[in-house]
Swiss-Prot record:
Associated pathology: Inflammatory bowel disease 25, autosomal recessive: A chronic, relapsing inflammation of the gastrointestinal tract with a complex etiology. It is subdivided into Crohn disease and ulcerative colitis phenotypes. Crohn disease may affect any part of the gastrointestinal tract from the mouth to the anus, but most frequently it involves the terminal ileum and colon. Bowel inflammation is transmural and discontinuous; it may contain granulomas or be associated with intestinal or perianal fistulas.
Subcellular location: Membrane
Pfam family, one: Tissue_fac
Natural source organism: Homo sapiens (Human)
Positions annotated as glycosylated: N49, N68, N102, N161
Any one GO MF annotation of this record: signaling receptor activity
Keywords, alphabetical: Antiviral defense, Disulfide bond, Glycoprotein, Membrane, Receptor, Repeat, Signal, Transmembrane, Transmembrane helix
Gene Ontology CC entries for this record: interleukin-28 receptor complex; membrane; plasma membrane
Transmembrane regions listed in the UniProt entry: 221-242
Protein known as: Interleukin-10 receptor subunit beta
PANTHER family to which the protein is assigned, alphabetical: INTERFERON/INTERLEUKIN RECEPTOR, INTERLEUKIN-10 RECEPTOR SUBUNIT BETA
UniProt topological domain (Cytoplasmic) ranges: 243-325
An annotated GO BP: signal transduction
Length: 325
């Protein structure tokens, strides 16, 4: 160990003495949701400030990505998500430069899955959760990590606030419901992306804590009773309205159209239909040439109608004629 430290110090002193530019240190790729940032650390250099150039291999030719930058990072998010990529960086000072430092990077395998978004809604004694897959850098707004990995699922863990016991579930869809929780209790929930075929898990989201309430849902049997009672009351009300309208109709009809009563003898006559038939056929059919005179029957006064009993049977002698001998 002491020999290695001595060799490193000796190398640094030799580089400083000869004026050689040291290479960048701790070169690494920081990739989250395909936002690929190549990072490094600037080495100690006595002559002045260093600049850096970063390149990537494309069709067997290295292409510049960042040139003469004073930053210690370079954005490679435009690289294809699939396949291996060779990247390299070097330090530069004036016309001098260090050796290249190479790394190999495969975005689809090496990128870190960031925390998903989550929306939590409390409904009585349950928590309704909706998950949002992380978005991808330099892609359409609707393009998410779920579109890249076919086996994408979620890991959800929840616990009572203030306790250490955690429960985990694996939803297959973008939503999940935690039911039958204790009422008036605060629960905390976290979610992360998970790839079963790669056995790769993403980063946990920040905990979201919500308090449940009491289940005030009306039982189904009570709903049925209320519905039946409502139907009965409606039918009863309709029946009452119909009876009231019928009474009003009858009263109005009698008030504006009083009933005309027939004589008793006409009622009896019309009550026997066979009498009507006999009366109809008792009269002979009239001829078209028959002439009818109008006959009026006038009742005689009672005073003038009085006669002697003997007069009713005697025949008068016409004037001017005497008895025959």
């Amino acid at each position: 160990m002491a020999w290695s430290l001595g060799s490193w110090l000796g190398g640094c002193l030799l580089v400083s003495a000869l004026g050689m530019v040291p290479p960048p240190e701790n070169v690494r790729m920081n990739s989250v949701n395909f936002k690929n940032i190549l990072q490094w650390e600037s080495p100690a250099f006595a002559k002045g400030n260093l600049t850096f150039t970063a390149q990537y291999l494309s069709y067997r030719i290295f292409q510049d990505k960042c040139m003469n930058t004073t930053l210690t990072e370079c954005d490679f998010s435009s690289l294809s998500k699939y396949g291996d990529h060779t990247l390299r960086v070097r330090a530069e000072f004036a016309d001098e430069h260090s050796d290249w430092v190479n790394i190999t990077f495969c975005p689809v395998d090496d990128t870190i899955i960031g925390p998903p978004g989550m929306q939590v809604e409390v409904l009585a004694d349950s928590l309704h959760m909706r998950f949002l897959a992380p978005k991808i850098e330099n892609e359409y707004e609707t393009w998410t990590m779920k579109n890249v990995y076919n086996s994408w699922t979620y890991n959800v863990q929840y616990w009572k606030n203030g306790t250490d016991e955690k429960f985990q579930i694996t939803p297959q869809y973008d939503f999940e419901v935690l039911r039958n929780l204790e009422p008036w209790t605060t629960y905390c929930v976290q979610v992360r992306g998970f790839l079963p075929d790669r056995n790769k898990a993403g980063e946990w989201s920040e905990p979201v804590c919500e308090q449940t309430t009491h289940d005030e849902t009306v039982p189904s049997w009570m709903v049925a009773v209320i519905l039946m009672a409502s139907v009965f009351m409606v039918c009863l009300a309709l029946l009452g309205c119909f009876a009231l309208l019928w009474c009003v109709y009858k009263k109005t009809k009698y008030a504006f159209s009083p009933r005309n009563s027939l004589p008793q003898h006409l009622k009896e006559f019309l009550g026997h239909p066979h009498h009507n038939t006999l009366l109809f056929f008792s009269f002979p059919l009239s001829d078209e040439n028959d002439v009818f005179d109008k006959l009026s029957v006038i009742a005689e006064d009672s005073e003038s109608g009085k006669q002697n009993p003997g007069d009713s049977c005697s025949l008068g002698t016409p004037p001017g004629q005497g008895p025959q001998s």
